[in-house]
Amino acid sequence: MADRKTKIIAVLPAYNAEKTLEKTLADIPRADIDEILLVDDASTDNTVALAERLGLPVVRHPSNRGYGGNQKTCYREALRRGADIVVMIHPDYQYDARLTPLLTGFIERGVCDVMFGSRIRTRAEALRGGMPAYKYFFNRALTALENLVLGQNLGETHSGFRAYS
């Protein structure tokens, strides 16, 4: 647990993450996070058993609520536990969890209220990292449209690696 006034909780919205959970968890800098919580969306593999074996607190959905429902539970539970900053890290290993302090640090210092990480620096890197080609295509198209409408130049607006105050 970090020695600071700000309570930072990492939430892992999981669905069938058994194969990548342990690797993701190993990369989260524990000194910079006060608590890690897994929210399982009715996985059919051994995600919950593995998370419990790894010592993670687990919130389980009895039935699949979908991606949005899982995120809502993550944020609601983190706030209930007293989080000042919530960082969401998908346990699918498409994001570099070692960068967590970069996301939370800007928020903790009052520079901004929200930080988004990105798994898309290059197409090849995203695809090698496990992102299906169709998801890459639609992610890029939707992000381009959103940038056009919002007048921004964001790299990825649908990131599973983000932090909020």
Indicate residue ranges for each PLM-predicted region.
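Donor nucleotide-sugar binding loop of glycosyltransferases
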Residues: A17-T20, S43, D96
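A short, conserved beta-strand element in the Rossmann-like catalytic core
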Residues: A42, G66, Q94
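Short beta-strand-to-loop acidic/aromatic patch adjacent to the donor-nucleotide binding site
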Residues: A83-D92
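A conserved acidic beta->alpha catalytic loop
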Residues: D40-V48
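Short, well-formed alpha-helical segments that are part of the catalytic scaffolds
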Residues: Y15-R30
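Conserved sequence signature across two-component system core domains
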Residues: A14, V39-D41, H61
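Acceptor/aglycone-binding surface of glycosyltransferases and processive sugar-polymer synthases
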Residues: V59, S63-R80, A97-Y164
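Cell-envelope/extracellular polymer assembly enzymes that use nucleotide-activated donors
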Residues: K7-I9
